[in-house]
């Protein structure tokens, strides 16, 4: 794993993320229509990622006031989490796999074996869906991605509503190996789709293709065992 110790939002941070399939977009990478076909959201994300891997820049993601509030409130949710649980948290940076295919930004480490993910309940619709109804489907893929990539023991999803008397609800997401395997399969399949778009774009530009990822590299054929003529086998010593 490679840790990129850059403040969030800086040019170095953005460069480290370029062309990387990230945990925050894992849900988009798995998105399909009612017929099970890749959705426009999935295909657009694949094309954006392929464009970045070819040296380009996808359109910047618009950050509205609600998104800015979510980023600003993260530190206060972390303080409340520590006060409630007694656990120490440590700063986390953007981390990628060695091949820089996949990456994620944890909100905080918990003893380097677990993590927290903070989601601020800015809109009332989000508040009631997640906190009241318990529907965390918008965030689950992101948390499972962290369990998969970093082999964490658990992720505490922190639903944060700072305007309420009891502002923090913690939902622990633990390892489910079958669920993690399904996500891994989908991420590898999505990367193959990105590679297809990348190859077609490089062909159109007349540039060299990139090296194949480790899981697509051909397996070398096993060397046959040497044969020995019967007369060449030495007689036993007894």
Residue ranges, per PLM feature:
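Acidic-basic catalytic patches of nuclease active cores, encompassing PD-(D/E)XK
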Residues: 66-89
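Charged, glycine-rich intrinsically disordered N-terminal tails and low-complexity linkers that flank
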Residues: 1-72, 208-238
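Context-gated lysine
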Residues: 27, 35-37, 41, 57, ...
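Nucleic-acid nuclease catalytic cores
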Residues: 85-198
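Charged phosphate-binding loop/patch that engages nucleotide di/tri-phosphates or the phosphate backbone
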Residues: 191-215
């Amino acid at each position: 794993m490679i840790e990129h110790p850059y403040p969030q939002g800086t040019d170095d941070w953005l460069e480290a993320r370029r062309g990387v399939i990230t945990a925050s977009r894992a849900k988009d990478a798995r998105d399909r229509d009612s017929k099970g076909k890749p959705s426009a959201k999935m295909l657009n994300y694949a094309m954006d990622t392929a464009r970045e891997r070819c040296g380009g820049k996808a359109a910047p993601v618009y950050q509205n006031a609600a998104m800015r509030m979510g980023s600003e409130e993260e530190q206060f949710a972390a303080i409340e989490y520590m006060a409630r649980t007694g656990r120490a948290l440590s700063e986390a940076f953007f981390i990628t796999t060695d091949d820089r295919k996949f990456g994620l930004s944890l909100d905080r480490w918990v003893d380097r074996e677990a993590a927290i993910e903070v989601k601020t309940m800015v809109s009332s619709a989000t508040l009631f869906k997640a906190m009241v109804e318990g529907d965390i489907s918008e965030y689950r893929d992101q948390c499972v991605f962290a369990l998969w990539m970093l082999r964490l023991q658990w992720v505490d999803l922190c639903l944060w509503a700072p305007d309420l008397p009891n502002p923090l609800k913690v939902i622990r997401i633990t390892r489910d190996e079958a669920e993690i395997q399904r996500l891994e399969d989908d991420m590898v399949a999505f990367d193959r789709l990105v590679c297809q778009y990348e190859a077609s774009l490089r062909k159109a530009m007349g540039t060299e293709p990139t090296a194949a990822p480790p899981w697509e590299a051909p397996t070398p054929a096993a060397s046959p065992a040497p044969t020995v003529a019967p007369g060449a086998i030495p007689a036993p010593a007894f």
